[in-house]
Amino acid sequence: MSTPAMLQLGLFLVVLIALAWPLGAYMTRVMQGENIGPARWCAPLERGFYRLAGIKQEEEMGWRGYAVALILFNVLGVAAVYALQRLQGMLPFNPQAMAAVSPDSSFNTAISFVTNTNWQGYGGETTMSYLTQMLGLTVQNFVSAATGAAVVIALIRGFARHSSAKIGNFWVDVTRMTLYVLLPLAVVFALVFTQQGAIQNLSAYQDVHTVETVKYQQPKQDAKGNPVLGKDGKPVMEDKTSQTQTLPMGPVASQEAIKMLGTNGGGFFNANSAHPFENPTPLANFLQDIAIFLIPAALCFLFGRMVGDRRQGWAILAAMTIMFATAVVVETRAEQAGVPQYSSLGIDQRASQLQSGGNMEGKEARFGIIDTSLFVAVTTSASCGAVNAMHDSLTPIGGLVPMFLMQLGEVVFGGVGSGLYGMLIFAILAVFIAGLMVGRTPEYLGKKIETYEMKMTAITILVTPTLVLALTAIAVSLAAGKAGIANPAAHGFSEILYAFTSAANNNGSAFAGLSANTPFYNIMTGLAMFFGRFFMIVPILAIAGSLAAKKRLAVTGGTLPTHGPLFVTLLIGTVLLVGALNYVPALALGPVVEHLQMLAAR
């Protein structure tokens, strides 16, 4: 790994922690009901929302009531986003006259944005009206992130409270997270992105004259619009030229800010953050990396403060950071090493002052290997899924890294809320394993971990591997699944495995060589996203309710310290072991085989 790459990684981590520490302190006070900062002038608005909805702020819920409210809220969100897409042709703010989205794509997209996945089987600039983007997708970017944060806050209350039947009020948690944390941060980042060059308007698309004439070929058509075929049965191509280009417009910066802060990832444009209107400069690119990790990192500090031991938050953050930094190193080395076959084609892959070198296929020249590799690791460590390069064009090991980061359960920082509650589940598993090894009843943060908690933990951990492996097996077994594969053999399998890994773990990135906008993939990935989200959340809330009802145990000489290097090592080992056991056979059929084939073809 080169010196510039190490310096950028170091700078990224320093800036991240410097911003996350005060944000964590602020979020702690906000979620505990203190009126500070924006809460002072937003408090009347908050109370107005409660009166309008008939919510009593002081009334808390048990875990079942919390879960029911959460699921109802999200199901209504799915219905609203689905309706917007189906009716957008008749609604305003549609200067390009976008037609209604197909039923299967609308179903997929509605679930995708409500579950914080933002998997996209469509191109935003050719499919969605401005109203759908703003009122449907951007709104869900806020509330889906707030939902994840609410769940982890409820789980933390389970650890912090004792002899209590309540874990909080879902409506209050979502409202406060949105009003006081997500909205102010989104305004700041949107203004910065606009200053950097991201667009923000409601104008119709602009036709402009290009600097030079573009020459291209397209299939010749007869009078009825059917392709003309040659004697060999292939379409007859005809030469075309163009001196104009259509530039898409839209309210991009406002959506881009919450897309990153909420670890959502769905792009306004099909190229996502590789598009210069979304991610215009290297500085904007760096700030997008920071935005993705900012709230997940701050939640670690919030965790330490709420349970009364800040060292606990540092331990969780340390485990996440070690795994993330390792992933960045492996990703950067794999992409900088390049592809051996390129050398025989006369392609220079050596780094120099004029080029990044390495595997530049599918990457933006303005970002190069270092910026791209960091972004790849960030977006798949978090459940973001935004991309500034095409992951399908990564080297086999370069593609394995983001896939494996997702397969760990999106716990390496992870999504807003979902990353921390996933890591806390692994922490419970780690102390259970440690307890078995020394013959003691396991406990974590003063709470005894018993049969009920372990049953719920097992369900939580097994949900996503079951979905990923079962749906991948179905897809490679059916003609409808195999029809979407654009690449043969190992890489084609990797495309399907990546798709369901991304969907079930609520990431949203893709190996774009898979043609996924079909009824089969829209329905299958939609189900993976829905069950991958809510079949994890409900058991986690059950754990929160069970822990809150327990009495706090006194620390003794036999209590396992959960704030030191030993526990950090145990936690990392548990996460990696579970990931390896679940997915290594599938990875061996995809990226591992592909890497060996690449080396053999030198």
Curated annotation (Swiss-Prot):
The chain crosses the membrane at residues 5-25, 65-85, 136-156, 179-199, 283-303, 312-332, 419-439, 458-478, 523-543, 566-586. One of its GO terms (cellular component) is plasma membrane. It is a multi-pass membrane protein. The keyword Repeat does not apply. Residues 221-248 are annotated as: Disordered. InterPro entries: KdpA. It is found in: Cell inner membrane. Its main location: membrane. Residues 231-241 have a biased composition (Basic and acidic residues). It holds the Pfam family KdpA. One of its GO terms (molecular function) is P-type potassium transmembrane transporter activity. Keywords: Cell inner membrane, Cell membrane, Ion transport, Membrane, Potassium, Potassium transport, Transmembrane, Transmembrane helix, Transport. The system is composed of three essential subunits: KdpA, KdpB and KdpC. Belongs to the KdpA family. Part of the high-affinity ATP-driven potassium transport (or Kdp) system, which catalyzes the hydrolysis of ATP coupled with the electrogenic transport of potassium into the cytoplasm. This subunit binds the periplasmic potassium ions and delivers the ions to the membrane domain of KdpB through an intramembrane tunnel. This is Potassium-transporting ATPase potassium-binding subunit. It comes from Chromobacterium violaceum (strain ATCC 12472 / DSM 30191 / JCM 1249 / CCUG 213 / NBRC 12614 / NCIMB 9131 / NCTC 9757 / MK). The gene is kdpA.
